[in-house]
A protein has these predicted regions:
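Sec-dependent bacterial lipoprotein signal peptides
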Residues: 1-26
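A small-residue-enriched
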Residues: 26-50, 89-162, 260-281, 292-377, ...
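Post-signal-peptide N-terminal segment of Sec-exported extracytoplasmic proteins
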Residues: 45-89
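Amphipathic alpha-helical coiled-coil scaffold segments and their short linker/junction regions
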Residues: 63-68, 72, 76, 91-93, ...
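Transmembrane beta-barrel architecture of outer-membrane proteins
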Residues: 83-85, 150-152, 198, 243, ...
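Sec/SRP-type N-terminal targeting helices
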Residues: 98-99, 161-189, 239, 243, ...
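Periplasmic alpha-helical coiled-coil/stalk elements that build and connect Gram-negative outer-membrane
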Residues: 167, 176, 183-300, 410, ...
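Acidic, low-complexity, intrinsically disordered peripheral segments
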Residues: 277, 290-292, 441, 462-497
Length: 497
């Protein structure tokens, strides 16, 4: 008899292990693997080892480097302590970053709560007390009814057995979405730093261009006064005065626009730093305090997709969609839930802990969907969401590649433009010096001298804009390659790569 029971028990155990093995083989889909990086298109990379140089401020050549450390804050290479302090303030006080940080904490807590639910058994203490009356007539018997009390105390334990892998995939999806929030926060930080740097450079450019514009207005006023004097002496016609007056008013019309742009830049800078516009003094930036970075990153596409936080965020969403598809697949297979309870029941509180009051129960429940049209539809919907996430990831990668290629071309092209404008400025300066010598010798009029001075001022305004653009190009390139955060050098992905 004992041998028969032992054989039956062994057969039951083998059947249980066989069922577990079969369900484990139906685990919800393969593990997520990071998409292959795009091919390294050398045609988008700079063909030279350095940019063009110009004989002017902020005109030095910049070297391209494929092994540049991109984890450090890149904005410190611009050489402005005021900018460093303002970016630090913005990173600490920005309400946009505060919102992103709170959203990340929410995702982390939700992930922890769900992990505790799916990975660990659930235990509950249940205390009960009830009073009820029974009627013998309900059982076809005669006699009066009986009233009694029932006291109970028990501990129940429940655990969902994750043989099909649905719980594991659900946790993977939550972890991926938490990582998505983290990468979004990093992208917001980098975007904020780049915006502050760009607006500060714009403000410095406006200061220099405002000085040049005011000098042009002063020069035209001098020319107009001289023309009126010549008209009074009969040496010029009134048309000359009218022409100069038109040029003067045209130049003056740029001053309100310049003031508007300067105020808008100040307001934007205050907002980025977490301040209300006009509530506190902001640093006054000038081009002379900035330094052009000597080395710039030359990044190949396969490295870029591992570095930019927005690409990593898109990859996290792709992994979450893959895990959601696994959850939908797992629902098609049997679900097993184990539960157990141990406690006491008695008619009175005093007898609750007596030797005969112990009760217990063990339950193993297996649920196999037989007819549920919603489950296949959910699986197809999850597959469509996975395909959409894959397409979105590809779009983000392509946009990142385009952004870096455009930024590199802008660095090269604007360096060449600055060199040309520097030559134009030098030619205007040489022309002015020649006109000054001729005026001193009496072979050139004062009007000709003023015209030469105005040409120099106009060339200087264009030169200032080109100098500021080189700084802006460098900042945008660092942002495009994902520099400035700890994950820029090596990104730890969710699947252990």
């Amino acid at each position: 008899m004992t041998g028969t029971f032992t054989r039956q028990r062994a057969t039951g155990l083998r059947a249980s292990w066989l069922l577990a093995a079969l369900l484990a083989g139906c685990a919800a889909g393969p593990d997520f693997r990071r998409p292959l990086p795009p091919a390294d298109a050398q045609g988008t990379l700079p063909a030279t080892v350095q940019t063009a140089s110009a004989a002017t401020a902020l005109g030095q050549a910049q070297q391209w480097n494929e092994r540049m450390d991109l984890g450090a804050p890149w904005w410190r290479q611009l050489g402005s302590p005021q900018l460093d302090a303002l970016i630090d303030e913005a990173l600490a006080a920005s309400p946009t970053l505060a919102s992103a940080q709170a959203t990340l904490r929410q995702a982390q807590e939700l992930q922890g709560a769900q992990a505790a639910t799916l990975q660990w058994p659930r235990a509950d203490l249940v205390l009960g007390s009830q009073r009820q009356r029974t009627s013998p007539s309900a059982q076809g018997q005669a006699g009066p009814g009986r009233e009694f009390s029932l006291q109970s105390a028990s501990i129940g334990v429940q655990y969902p057995l994750d043989l099909a892998g649905g719980n594991r995939r659900a946790l993977e999806a939550l972890a991926a979405r938490t990582e998505h929030r983290r990468y979004q926060l990093e992208a917001a930080r980098l975007g904020l730093a780049a915006s502050v740097a760009s607006v500060a450079i714009t403000q410095a450019r406006l200061v220099a261009q405002g000085e040049a514009l005011q000098a042009i207005v002063d020069n035209l006023q001098q020319q107009g006064a001289l023309a009126r004097e010549r008209v009074r002496l009969g040496q010029a016609s009134p048309d000359e005065v009218l022409a100069l007056q038109a040029l003067l008013e045209q130049a003056r019309s740029g001053l309100p626009q310049w003031h508007k742009q300067q105020q808008q830049a100040a307001h934007l800078l205050a907002t980025l730093a977490g301040r209300a516009p006009g509530t506190a003094a902001l640093p006054a930036f000038t081009l002379s305090e900035f330094r052009l970075p000597e080395v710039l990153p030359r990044t190949i596409p396969s490295e870029l997709v591992r570095r930019r936080p927005d690409v990593q965020a898109a990859q996290a969403l792709l992994q979450a969609a893959s895990a959601d598809h696994g959850v939908a697949v797992a629902r098609l297979y049997p679900q097993i839930r184990l539960s157990a309870s141990l406690g006491r029941q008695a008619l009175s509180t005093g007898a609750l802990f007596g030797g005969e009051s112990a009760v217990w129960g063990l339950v193993a429940q297996l649920t196999q969907p037989l007819f549920n049209p919603a489950l296949p539809a959910e699986r197809r919907a999850a597959l469509a969401a996975l395909n959409a996430a894959a397409a979105n990831y590809q779009a983000v990668v392509l946009d990142a590649l385009r952004g870096v290629a455009d930024a590199m071309r802008a660095v090269e092209g604007d360096a060449q433009a600055l060199a040309a404008l520097a030559r134009s400025d030098a030619a205007a300066q040489a022309s002015l010096q020649s006109m000054e010598r001729q005026h001193a010798l009496g072979s050139a009029s004062y009007v000709q001298l003023l015209v030469a001075q105005q040409q120099v001022l106009q060339a200087r305004s264009s030169l200032v804009a080109a100098q500021a653009q080189r700084l802006t190009d460098s900042a945008l390139l660092f942002q495009a390659v994902g520099a400035g955060w700890e994950g820029a050098a090596s990104v730890a992905t969710l699947d252990g790569r």
